[in-house]
């Protein structure tokens, strides 16, 4: 399967990257705090915690910060290492999930997808599922079938199999999530396996969005990469985003330390130098800060973004791009959990979960700043974003430092909100 980058490379689109609106200083945000943000990131590079990072902040319709620190790859005695650049490519892992969820919302608006439909309506391998009881070692029938809504909000009874146990062992034995398996192969492997809880009764971060990707492929009749290109990347001008990076652009790809600088644990990242068989809706994309900002402009604009050549772009002639209605974006970014229990510690205190994003339920309770209604998510490789509609603000931080992710998710919002 060809990379979504290939056609763009052939047509020389790599020479053009849409510009985000820029604001000359002084900005609506405090310049001293913005300078401090960059300095803090540089300090982390100097301390050997990060190879490098790219930060982007967009406030009140303008990009007020887009900066790079450090290097694209860890220092090497054998060769010169390129400096981190604003257009460096990063594996964004689970920051893929909101984009796939956006496409599901588009299909819902078109009447081609119902969130109340059982997953088995689209993927028959998920019919007749059973739930495993770790205490008794037995399985029981589901009390109700998992729905598309459950996939979007991670309440389908699926898992990521990071922990020990009978069901995680079954995932590993079936090679669930193998990069050598297609989305159809994933469904065949995962569908017959027992669930870890009854659908709709608990939030548990899982392979649910990967299964959603298979649903999208069934509805559209084409690969996930082709769907995302046609529906999202093309219209928004996200020319640097896809499931792999062509050879001519691999010099722009960021890499992590071989081992975590604090724990010594190995940190292998997915290989994105060739088109994967598995186009993972849950974690497979490569992107840049500018490209992901185009997606977040759409989200902050409640379904509408300036055209790739928009008011402050390259020629000022681009028409706005509308991919969703504003009510649908509001629905997507509302809390869909209520009082459901949450498994694990991935979802921070003070947050619920919408359809592909964590949603802040109160200004307090959490350990990081943010308004109620603010939504966010991160990627395993060391990437993070948040959108704050109340402040007309979004921010992106891209690194390739898996071991520092949780710390950065706490640090970065504090640095950004300090500039308001």
Can you name each region flagged by the protein language model?
Residues 28-92, 112-114, 128-137:
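Short, conserved catalytic-motif segment at the N-terminal edge
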Residues 35-41, 61, 91-119, 209-217, ...:
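Active-site SXXK
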Residues 5-11, 76-81, 304-319:
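Intrinsically disordered, low-complexity terminal tails and inter-domain linkers enriched
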Residues 64-65, 385-386, 392-400:
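Short, well-ordered beta-strand elements
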Residues 374, 381-390:
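Short, surface-exposed beta-strand/loop micro-motifs that present aromatic residues
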Residues 62, 121, 128-310, 315-369:
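Short, surface-exposed loop or secondary-structure junction motifs
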